[in-house]
Amino acid sequence: MFKTVYKLLTKLYTITKIILSAHHRRKDKMIDEKGNFYKPERGSTVNPDHIMLAFCGDPKTEMAVAWRTSTEVENGFISYSEIGTDSLINVESISEVKETDIDVSRYHWVRLKGLKSGTKYRYTVGDATHRSEEFTFETEPENLDKFSFIIIADHQKGDPCHLPDYSCVGRMMKTALERHPECRFIFTAGDNCDNGQNDLQWNGMFEGLKGIIESMPYMMTTGNHDNRGYITYFPEPTGKFYLEHADFFDFQFGPIYPDNGPEGYTGENYSFDYGNAHFLVLGINAPEKVSPWAYDDLQKTDKTWKLGSYHFPIYPVMPEGQNNDAYPWLRKPIEELDILFAGHEHSFARTYPTKGDELFDKPSQGTVHYITGNGGGNIYHSNARKLWHSAFYPQEERMGSYTLVEIDGNVLTATAYMEDGRIYDVMTIDKDKDLLLPYALAPTYDWTKMAFKGDMLELIARELYAQQKDGVWYAPFGVVIQAIGGKVIKEKETLYCEAYDHHALFTVGSNKALTDLGTVEMSGEAYFDRNQLYVPVEESAKIFEMEWYHAKRNNFINWNTPSEDKPLCKHPTE
């Protein structure tokens, strides 16, 4: 569904930009009743705020810092030194004035180069008059192959609407860093704020993470919320839109993130190395353009670990989830990774090592897809374990969660924590032994199992299975439609199915289906078996705009639909 919405909204991109520009020129939310400009709550001032560290290149010798001030501050600089020395070095920032939907501010960025590896530094930012408090950072040591980082996702907050409260993620991260003081940086899997095109949301996020990301590099992945906005937020948010690029994200963070992404889509796409690991960060836009860059990027690294992030899970836990938004394009680079971290679904899950939609046992055989839960206490109520998941936790308690990733040479351990310290999953990958713990063998079935979006149709399909005859796959399709909430009428020699605004009538002994789009000729005749009418999988799927595949190694057929609508058969009210 997101891909369809994306295509439609991309067509409206230019129109939306014009609307936004006009809105900004009016300054509707920055003018009082007397026509005077005023600052919003949490707006920029002469004192630096939104201070944040990031890796911009080689973490052994480089570090980037960003901050924000009001426009009265015409220039800025960072003043830094090695801890234990008094010799301060000043580096002037590059800066740019930005008019957002509610404010006008000057944004500052500095990339420090020529630093010493494994060295602690102290720094302040601002201009000659208005300085920040002192913060610290540490560069990566030489020959580092033992380190840890924390990954979080979906810590966005939409309320209170005009002053969003990000204290949940801030509280969680402060606790996590007290629990794991050895962590080197924070990594995210997207949805860092609720509406990334709106300034007040970033104000909330920076307020929540104050006291953390000034001294801990914060490497973000964009999610759909980071990419969206509202034309106006007052008195209530109206005019929701998505842009072709995560414009405000790219503006704020592109200057401090590695400038090595695909042309036209840097900022939200980048890669970096730390220790013996390579990190590939994938934005949600233009996957067909991002994919060649991503694959080429991975071919160039010789790091032991290849870790990636992409907000939308390829193998979802949502009952309506689907993966065709980007996977057809991104499959090639993603299958080069050891782990792909995702978010979006606000629960935890991880897959068996997966490649070509088949499930394996050994980490060398595929990519582990790891959904990181949520860092903001934002819960979903209908998530469930799918056939491709070796581990799952619904996370329906209103508190945040995070994952600690520890790398020690050829061994990686990912430990998933609730905010209060309870552990709900531990995964270890040992490259030397080609072993993934805890032990979990990927299923292989004797009868060809049937699943829809990863949900096994076991209860309704007991003792039923798909069959292959003369190279054609057949299935009791009425059972599939019943299982997903569609309408099914079974009569002596016919089967009527209705779902997703389509319908079809299948008849025993016929290779033709009567549908809402006319007569469809199928690759085989419908037949009775096991008290069900079996019809060809290929044509029946196409009639209902579904996709399907047969995972040969595991012997199951999975149907999918690009729609995230739920075709529930509701009881009539009249």
Predicted segments, located by residue:
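Acidic, histidine-bearing metal-coordination/catalytic regions of metal-dependent phosphoesterases
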Residues: F2-D159, E178-R179, D408, T415-Y445
